[in-house]
Curated annotation (Swiss-Prot):
UniProt keyword list: Hydrolase, Manganese
Family: Belongs to the metallo-dependent hydrolases superfamily. Adenine deaminase family.
MF terms in GO: adenine deaminase activity
Assigned EC number: 3.5.4.2
Biological processes per GO annotation: adenine catabolic process
Catalytic activity: adenine + H2O + H(+) = hypoxanthine + NH4(+)
Cofactor: Mn(2+)
Coiled coil: none
Domain of life: Archaea
Organism lineage string: Archaea, Methanobacteriati, Methanobacteriota, Methanomada group, Methanococci
Record HAMAP family: Adenine_deamin
Protein name: Adenine deaminase
Amino acid sequence: MIILKNANIVGVRNGTIVNGSIGINGDKIAFVDYIDYNNHNNDNIYNKNENTQEIRRKQRFNTRSEAPVKIIDLKGKFVCPTFIDAHIHIESSHITPSEFEKYALKYGVSKVIIDPHEIANVVGVNGIKFMLNDAKLLDVYCMVPSCVPATELETNGAPITSKDIEELFKQNNYRILGLGEVMNYIGVINKDKNIIDKINMAKKYNKLIDGHAPQLTREDLINYVNMGIMSDHECTTEDEALEKLQLGLKLMVREGTASKNIYLLKIIDILKRKGTYNKLFKNIMLVSDDISVKDLKEGYLINTLKKAVKYVSPIEAIQMITINPANYFGLDMEIKPDNYADLIIFDDLEEFKINSVIIKGKFLNELNKYNKNNNIKNNKNNNDNLINKSINYNYKTENDFLIDGIDGGGAPISTNSKVRIIEPIGSSLITNEIMLNIDDAKTKLKNNEINRIFVLERHRNTNKIGKGLIKYLKTGTIASSYAHDSHNVIVIGNNLKDIAIAVNHLKDMGGGFVAVKDGKIIEQVKLNMGGIMGADGEYIYKKINDIENKTKNWSIIENNNLFLSMSFLSLSVIPNLKITDFGLIKNNKIVNLVEL
């Protein structure tokens, strides 16, 4: 038994901090005593020399009297439950769950609710099963992907059908909690049979239903919510967040690597002024959604807490990654008897400096849980289906990347023709559409003020290439096989030779990232598991840092994470102008690059 005495215990349900002690027996919390050690004679409380006290405790909790009791005086350090990341795509960190957990546990994250639609878009149901079972200590729960592919306007590797979803729900796996983010909100509003069948399947098995409704408002939002959607993580304005909360949605405030919306916590003051705080605060959570391996390794949710306390109290910040998501997902994340002893010991609640992490009753630094050779062996044995034949297109030439109307060819073009340009907006996933006169577009393309962007279908060798123009790079060419949600190959650049080199090198690597300039490969990151992940976290962390550092001056957009931001340019369910292997997509419709 371990007794943590003189602890400031964070009560996440009531928002309190009370001095006391916590007893840990095996992997569970045995007792919690609220004793103010600052105003109590400590000599008789859990004194190592007080054998009577030890025996009494052992008898009470049915432990053998000869078993040792380890008493640790925390001297007022703060103890709170470990954290939940309530909505995350682990694949965005480009490492497997067994690698992800090494960093997550270090920063006190013991539970994650994943929506593995990234790997599902590549290899289908097998990818979901892999993501659920790969981690060893991290508690991985799953929302089954609802929109694979995200829309019918792109080509993915394998669909997830209503039948697939029912088979997963029927397994009665306690870690399968519901239906993942319903991105096809237009289909929901228009009662598209395919997505409605999936929603009804979740209702049939009493599962939760996560939402995805960027900029959806008023009647459309009401219709969306009325179909049974329960949460949303796509808010970007305070009005949007308040409207969704008032309609009963759980609000997931996202603070990821590409999209940063923690400023939405300003609404908590509004709730307090309106007198609705007590009713609605419990429905607010902090989530990552998509996080890079760099941000994962360098702080994860601890960094999110540090940002959150600019808007809320430390306890409120902690509640949004413990009790609030726990209540939504039906989990138990309090410090109370019979719960698992998953605890974080903090030196303070200002900088959130972690002293220790306890997982299932054991201090993290004492757990001999990672045998590197076994991890590599297990990944290899279990995941050959994720590794081989990931990039399935023929080698490309410069001619494959000529654009009708820009490089000649196609229908006759008048000097009054307009060209659509994709314009990313800072750290937002939303893009603008710019219309340029065709001659102006050609001039800007020649001067590297705008770039070519292509999406190559890579799963079924259909030879489809979506073609467009974008305001993104000052120089160089970048390409990636990680591009939401179907993870076709996306490439941006101006030099046709470099573009061909980049996509052909990705094929040879089996997937990943590559940067090319003046005919030379500047840097690369190999992601040979479905073209989106790898099994060596330290390698991927180093190589992603290397490629980001070598390309950081290439971006037109200040402080832009080039590869992560690029990965969302093909996510056509996010407004306004995106690109898939079908071409340019606007408002869920294919639009022409050149308007005659």
